[in-house]
Amino acid sequence: MNQPSLSLPSFAKINWSLEIPGKRADGYHEVKTLLQTVSLHDELHFELSDDRAVSLSCDNPDVPTGSDNLIVRAAHALQERFEVEKGIRIRLEKRIPIKAGLGGASSNAAVTLLALNRLWEINPGGGELFEIAAKLGADVPFFLLGGCVQATGTGTTLSPLPSAPDPLRQYLIVITPNAGISTAAAYNALDSRALTTKNANPILSVSQSEANSGHSQPWTLEDSLENDFESVIFDIEPEIRRTKEALLQAGALGALLAGSGSSVFGIFAGKEDQQRAANEIQLEAGWRIFPCVTVSQTEYLRAIGS
């Protein structure tokens, strides 16, 4: 007899803005960021098993599938928290580049929480999934919501913001270069320099006031893009800087490092400009290019069935 199963997309993210105002006494960094889901995505397939075993397979041999993978950790966290006696077989079709600042692992973990909540019929109380998600990683709670969300504190205090309707969606190109840098190395490099002391990026302040007032005003994203990691990472890996230069030379209205890198995204005026640029950009060896669009919270929740 076939076991109950479920397949869900697992979307990537970019950061419209990412500021690190300082480091807290507990060693964690303060974060001010504006996160956005985009259409680039993995696929996760779940099938119940007769025992409590959690197994993971992946079509990308570079992705570890053992107990350290966030997908497996998410499943075990649910089993332990709610004393689940069922198991799960999970298959990951990996399309989001790994260790590229696009939140792939965090997205996979969040989608696993949502899928197993349904397949294992857990029905947790309010906030319990978010609590588990926050323990798995700073970006995991965001992927329970999707869309455009402001994150502050250590990155787990979330404030959803008005998402643009489909006609105003943003057309993007993401480039992932061959060079990479770990999140830990990025933070270490940032710590060696003065952290942000200026006021919050205008996009954060304006967006928060819109959320509070219930009125949305057009954003000039290309004028507000900011990432505190850019200067240090561009110095460490000049190849990553060249991806931004390539996007701007191809006509991007603005371009920015995604998260702590190594991917860079560019914003284009529309679908035609996006397609033209994707065909014209001269890719260096090992570079990967991903044309995509923003995914609103409504679209996101519909896609993952929440």
PLM region spans:
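ATP-binding N-lobe of GHMP and related small-molecule kinases
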Residues: M1-A100, R118, I122-F130, T152, ...
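Short beta-strand scaffold segments in enzyme catalytic cores
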Residues: D42-F46, D139-F143, V149-Q150, V264-G266
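Short, basic/glycine-rich phosphate-binding loops at helix/coil junctions
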Residues: D50-D62, T112, A134, H215-E226
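Glycine/serine-rich anion-binding loops at beta->alpha junctions
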Residues: R91-W120, A138, L253-F268
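Conserved, helical-rich catalytic subdomain that frames metal- and/or nucleotide-binding sites
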Residues: L145, Q150-G254, A269-S306
